[in-house]
Amino acid sequence: ITPRLDTHGEVNLILTNGSHLTAEWGIDVKVGDTFTVYAQSTDEGTMGRLTACLPADFNLDRMVHYSVWPDSGMAGIGSSARWRAGNDGIRESEGTIIINGGNIRAKGQDNASAIGGTRAEEIEFRSTDRGKIYNRRQGGSITINGGVVRTEPFALPEGNPLAVISVGIGTCHYGYGGSVTINGGTVIA
């Protein structure tokens, strides 16, 4: 078990007035899953809050053992990269995220969206007798109907010459397809 919240099927989260849920390692929403957020009210001063802001470093030395290890490139809310026993890895296609209300703050890691998915072209790589097969990673659907949504892409310390490939909302670099629809609310990305 990992500290990352993992959705299975349809998950509805209702943020009651004055509540604050912090998902320190984010919320995983992979293909086939739908994560919908509601708020009890529309008053910014009282509506519930959801924070899914990932740390820049998170036990990279793997001193704590997990059966399914979240890897770098995790979205604050969305799909991620995971490694199972040894070096067997998978980068997930994205699911469906619907935000109807609430005060939402999200930040992904380097190579991931704050709300969306991981940076990768293929889900997994394997070789066969006939050559290489790539299973293309698909973008998901993100709809914002209300609430206050604040995202920030991962940023390296000032002066670091490395490029950062992250976005606030949407499919991250190399993902195929996907959509972002904003029907209402306040969005700062």
What are these regions (language model features)?
Residues 1-189:
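A composition-driven surface/loop motif
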